[in-house]
Amino acid sequence: MARTEMSVRPTPPSSVLRPVTALQPADASVTREFTLRKLPNTCPDSMWMINDLGWDDITERPRLETTEIWSFINKSGFSHPMHMHLVQFQVLDRQPFEIIGGQVVPTGPAVPRPAEEGGWKDTVRCDPFEITRVIARFDGWTGLYPYHCHVLEHEDNEM
């Protein structure tokens, strides 16, 4: 039996994070909107949808080397962690709204993302009755970019 001893000096984490170059909204060639909601008069927890579509063909086809803004409009009383595959994005802002006469009506200005949401993401929390905007640069992948809610029951039912 052998015994090995090592001297380990823990290194404290850096107090300075690597800077992240912010993507600029002016560089976005496309803005897309995704409405998150539960369809009325359906099974209790099974019909959460994006843009009222389920099990449909591909509806978004970002072009390689382009920048896009995606707005997640959460019309539900439930937070949705929206996840995008094969691309990282930055959170831009959130804007509260009410639904008046079936229309989304902002109730205040867009609020810039908090510091803890700085940096690159692949999942963003979309809170109830808020528009959450993210910006992404579609580089390095010529295939499809799947996206979905990361709540398992919602994901399984095509949200």
Label every PLM stretch briefly.
Residues E153-M159:
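Short acidic/polar inter-strand loop motif in beta-rich domains
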Residues M1-G140, V151:
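Edge beta-strand plus adjacent loop/short-helix module at the start
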